[in-house]
């Protein structure tokens, strides 16, 4: 895990341009402005979603760790991805749930930027890991004879570590730069999480270069990895069409189908939210989009893999002890 140094308080211009700056040690996450009964309903709904997400991804990671037959690079990558999903959803949802029942809905200055850092870093690590998983699929289908010699346990470990390290380094500089910027009151972020878009709206001084830097990094992560995945699966599709056996084509398609579904779900939401932030999106829609990729996507991922993959379904039945449960 990469160390992150943030100033604990921010500077806020409290009145006129010539006035002094006041230290601020917290933000207010406005969230959804609705009646108390609706807040309780949303709390119950998102608590259930969070519990199901943790349970589903935890079950996938656990069965892949327990079943030695699935200790292959493809399934170990999936286990790491499920483990990442647990931490990804936990970087924002617990605080969000607390705020549903809180009157003030505050978050400390350092806590806000740490949430932003971990949310984006874990998301970046997931994007990188999905790309590595696509590369693994390419090797397995397009280079089956060379696959055991290329995708060794040593290379697998290197790729996983690289995804984690690069993910946590990618947004380190932007988060430090944003944390040092003075902002104008009130210290209210009109969002459900500490997102850079609403945070930039509070800045006293326009910082187009920093904003461009952040959006460029986001676009590089999203489009760079997405194009690599598209390229990998173009070659995979070409290899599949050249297979003489329909059984082989069906097996290859079933192996890739789950990963493609997860990639589509993940990148579609990311592109909508971060490629053109603030363009054509109302504040309410931005909150809904954030909830979708922060909670709904991690919930569906274990369902997609468990329903599509026979080996994982068999492993789940074995661990749960009953073939009638799955």
UniProtKB/Swiss-Prot annotation:
List the transmembrane segments.
45-65, 73-93, 113-133, 159-179, 217-237, 260-280, 288-308
Localization of this protein: Cell membrane
The molecular function terms in GO held by this entry are:
G protein-coupled receptor activity; olfactory receptor activity
Q: List the disulfide bonds.
A: 112-194
Q: Which InterPro entries match?
A: GPCR_Rhodpsn, GPCR_Rhodpsn_7TM, Olfact_rcpt, Olfactory_GPCR1
> Which Pfam families does the record match to this protein?
7tm_4 (PF13853)
Keywords, in A-Z order: Cell membrane, Disulfide bond, G-protein coupled receptor, Glycoprotein, Membrane, Olfaction, Receptor, Sensory transduction, Transducer, Transmembrane, Transmembrane helix
Q: Which residues are glycosylated?
A: 13, 18, 106
Q: Which residues lie on this side of the membrane: Cytoplasmic?
A: 66-72, 134-158, 238-259, 309-326
Q: What are its GO cellular component terms?
A: plasma membrane
- Entry membrane topology: Multi-pass membrane protein
Q: Does the keyword Cytoplasm apply?
A: no
Function of the protein: Odorant receptor.
Q: Which family does it belong to?
A: Belongs to the G-protein coupled receptor 1 family.
**Protein name in the entry:** Olfactory receptor 11H1
Q: Which organism is it from?
A: Homo sapiens (Human)
